């Protein structure tokens, strides 16, 4: 079953739009372990325990899982084995989106092969600044998808994303350009922002695309507008 079908069926089945991260962040996990009397365990053991607990608690309430590749790479070979365990723990019918924010053109084909053939991931996040060629190797795989990051919530990114002016900022140029790279079933957009107006501007430019939202929780009361 392809990514898009899995995603839409999980949304319908679980009546949710929640995408849950599976990020073994050392600072977060150490705090979590101390509060449960598990501080004497190895970090790898903690990560396994935490990931399994999160999946078991959320499997009926999410439409996708999204582990950040960098946290697993930082652990070395055991981290990549842990990512493979994540793939095995995620229930069938729930897509796995690997949050790689990949932007290196030379390694795209190799990463696409690893993620989609070896790991069995369903989608990957990409950084778009290298242009269409960054997405092409991933879109060669049928039934898989890419998620293009078009806006970051990081305050330091503002001067880049909103250049040269608010009437025609870079982030909207990215939204317009990348839609030509793949169909709505192949290419989604990720929007990180605490400003609902930015989300609204992206939606106006991309009315048919699925959007993955980040950093918008504090603005819940303003989303309907």
Model-predicted regions and their roles:
Residues 8-12, 84-91, 139-141, 179-182, ...:
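Surface-exposed amphipathic alpha-helices with a cationic face
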Residues 25, 34-38, 104-188:
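Conserved anion-binding
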Residues 50, 54, 82-86, 111-115, ...:
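A general structural detector for well-ordered alpha-helical segments in enzyme core domains, enriched
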Residues 189, 193-225:
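A C-terminal functional module that forms or caps the active site or interfaces directly
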Residues 14-18, 60-63, 92-94, 122, ...:
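Short, well-ordered coil/turn segments that N-cap beta-strands
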Residues 66-67, 72-75, 94-97, 101, ...:
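Catalytic beta/alpha-barrel core
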Residues 43-57, 107-115, 171, 221-223:
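Short, acidic/polar
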Residues 1-67, 72-85, 89-93:
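Conserved N-terminal beta1-alpha1 strand-loop-helix module at the mouth
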């Amino acid at each position: 079953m392809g990514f898009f079908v899995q995603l839409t069926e999980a949304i319908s089945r679980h009546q949710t739009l929640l995408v849950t991260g599976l990020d073994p962040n050392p600072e977060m996990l150490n705090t979590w372990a101390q509060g449960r009397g598990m501080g004497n365990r190895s970090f790898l053991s903690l990560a396994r325990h935490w990931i399994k607990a999160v999946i078991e608690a959320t499997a009926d309430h999410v439409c996708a899982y999204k582990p950040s590749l960098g946290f697993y790479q930082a652990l070395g070979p055991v981290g990549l084995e842990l990512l493979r365990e994540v793939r095995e723990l995620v229930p069938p019918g729930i897509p796995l989106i690997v949050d790689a924010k990949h932007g290196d053109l030379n390694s795209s084909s190799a990463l696409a092969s690893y993620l989609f053939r070896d790991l069995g991931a369903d989608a990957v996040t990409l950084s778009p600044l290298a242009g269409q060629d960054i997405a092409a190797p991933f879109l060669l795989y049928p039934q898989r998808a890419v998620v293009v990051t078009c806006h970051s919530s990081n305050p330091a990114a503002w001067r880049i994303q909103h250049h040269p002016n608010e009437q025609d900022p870079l982030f909207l140029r990215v939204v317009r350009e990348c839609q030509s790279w793949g169909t709505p079933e192949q290419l989604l957009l990720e929007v990180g922002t605490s400003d609902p107006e930015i989300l609204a501007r992206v939606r106006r430019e991309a009315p048919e695309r699925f959007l993955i939202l980040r950093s918008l929780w504090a603005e819940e009361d303003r989303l309907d507008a």
